[in-house]
């Protein structure tokens, strides 16, 4: 691993991308401690025992706990992305048309997603400031009034817009997917606090049951290792489809056709489905927390909690649904079949064109079924282990966070390796 990192740092353009990404993350961490005006964050910190608060705070790298300018994190952007991508499925004809226009269409959709993020962010900021103020018995907002709420909402929306821009800069000039890297950084920054909470609850003042607590922590370590191995396995697994190129094409050797393969990942969506599933579960619980405690809000808090049987079932269903959805966003069977036909390639025994598209679609459906089930299992595995061991809520959140951290780290390393291989290939061709 250290040798790989050393190889990355020897290449100037990759080194510059890594340094740029780290600088952007430093800016993100600084912003997490810049307070919003007219807010008494200590009043909100008193409510930190709420599970949804801990989850939001973890994904924001502690920004919500400080009620900083980045308190909303990147959640509005994730929500906007989900909605816009769902609307592309023949719901809004214009979006469907743009989705088929290649790079030009993607730019239009990305721009519309930005605008929608600002609108959602402003609405969420108003609701969050008003709701959390009620939750803190009116102690959160100083000099509460319409103008105060508007100023706070504008500052929070500006913070989310800046994070969105920061993520795009990392994607364009740094390494990895910018939004995922920001979520990754937020989670990693909360790990020391989570470890401290586990140590405090399991080992401080528990000398008479020390062995039992050691066993509990050992179970947690086993769950962590299982998640790491599981994520690596599911991210690396591919199905190779045999491809034959006809004689006389640019890919065929002088003596005739060439055989190769088309690799399809078992889980082409990565950990994006988990991020989206968590964001989907957070939203109703966050809204419910604004309205105090009653039968309805209790029902929402319980049934949208992924440690509750109903919430866990919803969580698993969302992961499977988003895995299928994103598999076909990342892999377009129609475009693949068309490209193969243009290049003179075909799957042995399958006619080029529509039949090839149907074969790729069929294989992708089967692969995604396996990938989605496996992803769902390794997502809930830490929850079972942690509940069985009786560890604190922060550890349960840490299980989901770990899945995202490992997945993002793996994808980023693969991207860096591909850039290194590409650069070495270019150097070889020049020589």
Curated annotation (Swiss-Prot):
UniProt topology in membrane: Multi-pass membrane protein
Instruction: Provide GO CC annotations from the record.
Output: cell envelope Sec protein transport complex; membrane raft; plasma membrane
Q: Does the keyword Magnesium apply?
A: no
PROSITE patterns, from UniProt? SECY_1, SECY_2
Q: Which residues lie on this side of the membrane: Cytoplasmic?
A: 1-17, 88-115, 167-177, 235-261, 330-368, 411-431
At the top level of its lineage, which domain of life is listed? Answer: Bacteria
What family does the database annotate?
Answer: Belongs to the SecY/SEC61-alpha family.
**Record note on quaternary structure:** Component of the Sec protein translocase complex. Heterotrimer consisting of SecY, SecE and SecG subunits. The heterotrimers can form oligomers, although 1 heterotrimer is thought to be able to translocate proteins. Interacts with the ribosome. Interacts with SecDF, and other proteins may be involved. Interacts with SecA. Interacts with FloT.
The protein here is known as Protein translocase subunit SecY
Name of the gene: secY
